[in-house]
């Protein structure tokens, strides 16, 4: 992915994602991480992909936003955190939008692992420890969005669905 021209935000960017299709708990992890950073005194901005959203432009999300317009995950994040949340499938435009008139110590992108047009400072991959990598094959033959070797390049690998705290 080195050949792609990437947009680099002036704000440190954390990507939360996975390498498999299906749920790994990315949104709950984003909520936990955002609240943890807020408790440490950090100003956090969050970008959500707006999955199943009808709006295609960067949109500021509140807890009372219409989920059909901005995506249900974005509304949930806005309700569960005291962060500014922007919903948009175009992560570069969403990043530009949220940082244009606001200051943040850190940006968190929910489900942004495969969006390589956006440079990232940190990558966190979540793995469902009950499903792991399925049959080990890439989509559509298996559940992998990327090769398992991606795990060698990320900053943190966290296993979910194991009933441990803090997440």
Language-model segments: what does each one mean?
Residues 2-63:
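Walker A (P-loop) phosphate-binding motif
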Residues 50-167:
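Phosphate/Mg2+-binding loops and adjacent switch elements
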């Amino acid at each position: 992915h080195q050949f792609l021209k990437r947009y680099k935000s002036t704000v440190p960017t954390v990507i939360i994602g996975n390498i498999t299709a299906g749920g790994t708990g990315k949104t709950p992890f984003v909520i936990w991480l955002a609240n943890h950073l807020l408790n440490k005194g950090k100003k956090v901005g969050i970008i959500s992909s707006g999955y199943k959203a009808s709006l295609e432009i960067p949109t500021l999300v509140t807890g009372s936003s219409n989920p059909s317009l901005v995506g249900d995950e974005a509304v949930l994040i806005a309700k569960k955190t005291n962060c500014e949340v922007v919903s948009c499938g175009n992560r570069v435009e969403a990043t530009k939008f949220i940082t244009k008139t606001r200051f943040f110590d850190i940006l968190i992108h929910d489900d942004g692992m495969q969006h390589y047009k956006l440079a990232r400072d940190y990558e966190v991959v979540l793995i469902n420890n009950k499903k792991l990598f399925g049959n080990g094959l890439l989509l559509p033959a298996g559940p992998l969005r990327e090769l398992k070797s991606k795990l060698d390049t990320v900053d943190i690998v966290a296993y979910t669905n194991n009933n441990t705290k803090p997440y």
